[in-house]
Amino acid sequence: MKWFFKMMLPALVLASCSKEGGSPVEVSPVSTKENVEVVAHDVIELGRKLENPYSVTNVGKALAALYPTRGEVSVPVTDYYVRFLPKDTVQFNLLSDLGVEMLDHPMDCEILRDGDYYHDPSVPEGEITWQYAVVPPDFVFPEGIRHEILDECFVPDDNVATRTLGDLDLDALERKAFEITDNADFLEPETRAKARPSGRITIVDDKLRSKKTVGVAGVKMVANVFVKIATTYTDENGNYEFSRKFSAKPRYRICFKNRVGFSIGLNLILIPASISAIGKGSSTGIDLTIDKNSDATLFRRCVVNNAAYDYFKKCQATGVTVPPKNLRFWILNILRPSSTLMMHHGALLDNKLVSKYIGKYAS
């Protein structure tokens, strides 16, 4: 799989010598303030396709139902719901550099069991799967990258495009769109106002002298309800707050692409940065505390993240040259050597040699 090896070039592989049980793809519950579903660190299981409440067509129907005596009102297109099929990491990285926030699974499908990744069955194993995204109407699609526009959408927000509807109650319009598309179960109670999700992601590390709870620093947080998507980063104490408001219950994910310039990337399939699903939660946000017993996979990712974050920060504070940009760590608990396998930027890799060490992860 050519793209696999191209993505390995800028990588640093962290080989864990831990003898703990479990696997990088284990099912574990997460601990939050609210009762959030049990999620898995393996493939996402999709159900039926859902009606997108943010499509211009459905918002138009909601508008007619909410204001039956009002004249015809044109619903503006604020976003395109699209999907891309990058043929290699060059194309994938080009989209990422353009600020396209991509998910590897459809945003308008029922999720029967959440997980860390999805691979479209129509795409051969070993190739990059379809990447789903939301882009503005004036987005210039890069030449040569296959893409499809799936829907024209109206996503209410505090911006010029949505204010063109004048004195209409956009919160009520959004709720009505969910109701007429049979998605009312996503909504928060009407008594709860729209909220900017916020919270704290922490770990309890018994290897620390104080055995204290520490924040997971600098990781990207992703929240979405259908095509309404938002991202932010945690601060050094693990606190986060999204700038976008939600009236429905978002699905939350931690993306281990750290804001200081490194990522942690190895699921069952290789992706640029590991994603850890933490399930659907309140629109006010999720507080999550992880230890090695509650979720060993997520715990390992967080510990490595914090160690790398601290090193980058100490380099910056002391004038030491920081590691190369786009550094990637792989966490493998299947190797016995206590030394860390390191690969130089631009290294050429032998598939047989890699397979000897990481087995099924190279296939």
Label each PLM-derived region with a short phrase.
Residues 23-25, 178-209, 303-316:
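A short, Gly/Thr-enriched small/hydrophobic beta-strand-prone motif that recurs across taxa
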